[in-house]
Amino acid sequence: MDRIKIVGGNKLNGVIPISGAKNAALPLMIASLLTDDTLTLENVPHLADVEQLIRILSNHGVDYSVNGRREHQNGPYSRTIHFTARNIVDTTAPYELVSRMRASFWVIGPLLARMGEANVSLPGGCAIGTRPVDLLLDALLALGAEIDIENGYAKAKARNGLVGARYKFPKVSVGATHVMLMAATLAKGETIIENAAREPEVANLADCLNAMGAKISGAGSSTIHVQGVTNLSGARVRIIPDRIEAGTYAMAVAMTGGDVLLEGAQESQLSCVLETLRQAGAEINETNSGLRVVRNGHGIQPVDITTDPFPGFPTDLQAQFMGLMTRAKGTSHITETIFENRFMHVQELARLGAKISLSGQTATVEGVERLKGAQVMATDLRASVSLVIAGLAAEGETIVNRVYHLDRGFERLEEKLSRCGADVKRISG
C-alpha cells in the first residue's frame, strides 16, 4: 500500500496547474446515460474515483475512448473522454461497484429517466457520517417514481415516464440536486427545484445538459426551472477547474510561506475561502492565468469558520483549514454543519503535535509554535490532504499512510508539490 513521505520546512514557490474538478466530472460523466449520442468531456482529471465511475458506466453498456495530452510541459495530464451510451444493457448497478464510491448511486436518476427503471445498490464512499440518500429518493418520488428498498438496493420504476413537479428540498444537497436535475430533463412538463444547491459544479452540469438539448434555467441559484424534452443529443463540454484542489494548495502556501500561482483557479468559485485566507495572513490576487498566493514573513492568524453550502465555506476544505490553523498564533474555532462525523483527522493531527479539542460539531484549535513529523494515517479523502499540509510545515519526517484516499481526489499531488520545492515523495508498496 502506497505512502507519502514528507520532510517539512520548505517554502512553496512556483506554478501549480489546477486540474478539472472531480465533483463536476462525476455528474457530467453520469449524464452520458441520458443520450444515445456521444458526450465528449474535456479536462477530465485522472483520479481513482473517475476510473471507478468509468467501470460502473461500462457495466451499463457505455462505450468510452480516452485522448490524453499534456497541455504544457509541467501541466496536468489533461484528458478528453468520449462517452457513448447507445445501448443500455443493464439497469442494475451492483453492490461490488457502487459500494466503493458514493457518487455512483447518482446513476439512478438518468437510468430511471431514460429506461423507466433502475436497480441501484445503496452507496459507499468516504466514512464521514451517514449521508442518507433520502433527499435524493424523495426528489425522484416527487417526479412520479415508484421506489422500494430491498436487500440493500433501491429499486425504482417510472412505468409511464417521469412527470415534472414543483419540489423544495428540505435541506440543501448537491448530490440530490444533480440527480433531480438530470432526471427532470426527460420528464414530461416543467420541474421547479427549490432550495437547490448553488455550487459551481451544479451550474457546470446544467451547462452540459443544456448543450445536450435540455431546457434549464436558474442553475447556480436556489431555484432551478427545467422544461422536459423528449430526448437529448451529444455535446462537447469542458469540466471546470477544481476549486477544492485550488483551495487546498492555497492553504498549503499559507502554511509554508512562499509564492505560488494556482494556474486556472477562479476567484468567483472561492471568494469565501480566499477572504478567510486573507484574514489568516495570505496575500491573494487574481491574474489573467489564475490566482497568485503569497505569504511572506507574517505569521498565521487565527480565524473562525463555519462550513456552509456554496457560497459559504465548503466542508471539503474544512480539514485542510484545520491543518493550517494548527500553526496559527492564537485560538480558532471550526464548526462543521454539513456532516456529523467529519473530524476524524483531529486525532492524526494531534500525533504531529496539534492541540485540538472537540465539543459537538465545533473544534477548538490552539495554534502551536511547531509541529513534529510522525507516522499518521489517512481516514478519508480531505482528511488525508490535511495531514499533508501539516507535514509540509512539521519538523522532520512525516509519513502519511493509506494514501489511496488521496488518489481519489488529487491528481499527482506529490508531483505538483515537489515541483514547487516541497520534499514530498510517494513510497510504493
From Swiss-Prot:
One of its GO terms (biological process) is cell wall organization. The keyword Cell cycle applies. The keyword rRNA-binding does not apply. It catalyses: phosphoenolpyruvate + UDP-N-acetyl-alpha-D-glucosamine = UDP-N-acetyl-3-O-(1-carboxyvinyl)-alpha-D-glucosamine + phosphate. Transmembrane segments: none annotated. CDD domains: UdpNAET (cd01555). This is UDP-N-acetylglucosamine 1-carboxyvinyltransferase. Cell wall formation. Adds enolpyruvyl to UDP-N-acetylglucosamine. It is found in: Cytoplasm. Phosphoenolpyruvate binds at K22, N23. Keywords: Cell cycle, Cell division, Cell shape, Cell wall biogenesis/degradation, Cytoplasm, Peptidoglycan synthesis, Pyruvate, Transferase. UDP-N-acetyl-alpha-D-glucosamine binds at R102, R131, P132, V133, D134, L135, K171, V172, S173, V174, D316, I338. The modification 2-(S-cysteinyl)pyruvic acid O-phosphothioketal is found at C126. The active site is at C126 (proton donor). One of its GO terms (cellular component) is cytoplasm.
